[in-house]
Amino acid sequence: MGTANDKAARSAPSATRRADIVAAARALYEERGLSKTSVQDITDRVGVTRSLFYHYFPDKEAVTSAVLDDYVADFIEATHYWNAQRRTGDIEHALSSVVKLMRLGVFEHDAFRRSLASRENAALYIDFVNRVADRIATYIVETTVQDYSARHRVRIDHVYETFYVLILGIVGYLRTHPDADDEALKDLIVQTLHMDRGRPETDDTE
């Protein structure tokens, strides 16, 4: 049977309680790192029992996955902001600002990001990056690519897949080459996407 504390806690809306646990886990991961945070630490921070934690999450891995979803949502929110700030027809500005966005995403330094970068958590890091690539590629195909195609020809097939691979490649390259030149990164994006950096096309001529 559950304790009185458990019953009181369960009276809170389920989604809110779950969000509280995820927020506590994220805060602790950022403060201490993944390996130094236990389920007990998380429940102590929220003020609930372990049995209530396990009502929402089967294990620490499950709540960590939810924390990753939070980070992905942050990155998507930043991408939405980037897209909203783009200047119509100004490809150079879009390239410069998206490179800055990618750098911020890769090099935000908190304990959890450092934990993800460790060999111990390599599989978790790959999962995180793949989630980011999927969500951002989907969003860009549905928004930015549509805007671009109104002014230029889209010269790539498999558009979603190309963006997915490009995002993975840029993130991986920046992690191993943090001093990479921004102009080189912009060139890589343009070459991969076969973008037209010149004037908008007005007909079907090459």
Which residues does each predicted region cover?
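N-terminal intrinsically disordered/low-complexity leader segments
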Residues: M1-T16, E201-E206
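Short hydrophobic clusters on alpha-helical segments that form packing/core surfaces
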Residues: R17, I21-Y29, Y71, I167
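Helix-turn-helix
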Residues: D20, L28-A62, A66
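Alpha-helical DNA-contacting segments of helix-turn-helix folds
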Residues: T64-Y71, F128
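Hydrophobic alpha-helical connector segments
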Residues: A66, E77-F107, V159-F163, K186, ...
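Amphipathic alpha-helical packing segments from all-alpha helical-bundle domains
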Residues: I76-E77, A122-S149, R153, D157-E161, ...
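Amphipathic alpha-helical segments used for helix-helix packing
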Residues: A94-S97, L101-D127, G172-T176
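Hydrophobic alpha-helical segments that form the core
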Residues: L101-R103, R153-T176, A180-H194
